[in-house]
């Protein structure tokens, strides 16, 4: 039996600690980002796949606990798939191509940052199969596998001519990368590993530059990526003057200035501090308000140093990439 990325007890503990004021539907994404950072999954080449697996495991846990309905989760997945394909595809299902009624060649929708066609995926599958000593798969069998995997979902089906051979054509399916990953998951373990890496690389090469996050879960996801860029940020995030807000008094030697981090990810500084307090990461009251709790300091996510600034006691807090 395959070992899960995180245990049910770890999921339960993370939800209890960090989602007190969060709507249930936002919990899977937020807790998945929490594990991506704390377990350093963001350093792996298949981090996008791991993030999706984490979300699925957390959703399953919430369904088991009665906090989410299966129908609600299924509706959200369908809505997400429709949104991803709707941005780039005029989605419709056409009648299957048959030899009795040859269909004219149709231009295949080109690959974008969100889509890939079955011919490109089939080529990648057969290259991986060849390297692993497995036989190649024919287009008709591959299309059957795709149709079975994507049953009830949105995708584009078209036809392409067999070169100069008149009257002969074959089906081509254009799908999202998320759907392609599920098709790839049907391959053997060795082939699957190679495919996932190649799909990730192809998607990143075709994806547009990331936009400023609009929600807190998106900001947490970006935090994992920013941790990898720490060395470049260190030179730019030096503390300014002594008489600035608490966050701007944080020195940056081995981490990220919390106030500047909020600006980088497009959040208001006070909103970020408020969320960290509400979720039990920072102290909420007293002289040590906004100071990280000891368990997060011990885990290496923050470093704290007590200093004196203009005859006032203060704290230097660094958000580390651990």
From Swiss-Prot:
Gene Ontology molecular function terms on file: DNA binding
A Pfam family assignment: ANT
DNA-binding region: 258-277
Cysteines engaged in disulfide bonds, as pairs: none
Keywords noted in UniProt: DNA-binding
Keyword DNA-binding (UniProt): yes
Taxonomic superkingdom: Viruses
Physiological role: Antagonist of the C1 repressor or repressor bypass function.
Name recorded for this polypeptide: Antirepressor protein 1
Name of the encoding gene: ant
């Amino acid at each position: 039996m395959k070992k899960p990325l995180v245990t049910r007890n770890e999921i339960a503990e993370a939800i209890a600690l960090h989602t007190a004021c969060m709507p249930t539907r936002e919990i899977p994404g937020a807790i998945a980002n929490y594990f991506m950072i704390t377990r350093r999954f963001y350093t792996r080449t298949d981090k996008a796949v791991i993030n999706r697996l984490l979300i699925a495991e957390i959703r399953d846990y919430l369904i088991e606990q009665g906090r989410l309905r299966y129908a609600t989760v299924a509706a959200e997945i369908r809505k997400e798939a429709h949104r991803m394909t709707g941005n780039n595809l005029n989605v419709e299902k056409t009648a299957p191509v048959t030899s009795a009624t040859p269909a004219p060649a149709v231009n295949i929708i080109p690959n974008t940052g969100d889509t890939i066609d079955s011919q490109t995926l089939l080529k990648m599958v057969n290259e991986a199969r060849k390297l692993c000593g497995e036989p190649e798969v024919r287009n008709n069998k591959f299309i059957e596998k795709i149709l079975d995997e994507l049953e009830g979902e949105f995708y584009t089906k078209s036809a392409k001519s067999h070169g100069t051979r008149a009257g002969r054509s074959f089906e081509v399916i254009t799908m999202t990368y998320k759907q392609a990953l599920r098709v790839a998951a049907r391959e053997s373990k060795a082939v699957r590993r190679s495919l996932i890496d190649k799909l990730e690389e192809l998607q990143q090469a075709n994806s547009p530059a990331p936009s400023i996050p609009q929600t807190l879960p998106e900001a947490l996801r970006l935090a994992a990526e920013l941790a990898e860029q720490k060395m470049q940020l260190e030179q730019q995030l030096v503390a300014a003057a002594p008489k600035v807000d608490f966050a701007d008094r944080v020195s940056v030697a081995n981490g990220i200035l919390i106030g500047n981090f909020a600006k980088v990810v497009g959040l208001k500084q006070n909103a970020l501090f408020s969320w960290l307090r509400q979720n039990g990461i920072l102290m909420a009251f007293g002289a040590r308000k906004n100071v990280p709790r000891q368990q997060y300091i011990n885990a290496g996510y923050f470093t704290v140093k007590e200093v004196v600034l203009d005859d006032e006691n203060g704290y230097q807090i660094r958000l580390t990439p651990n």
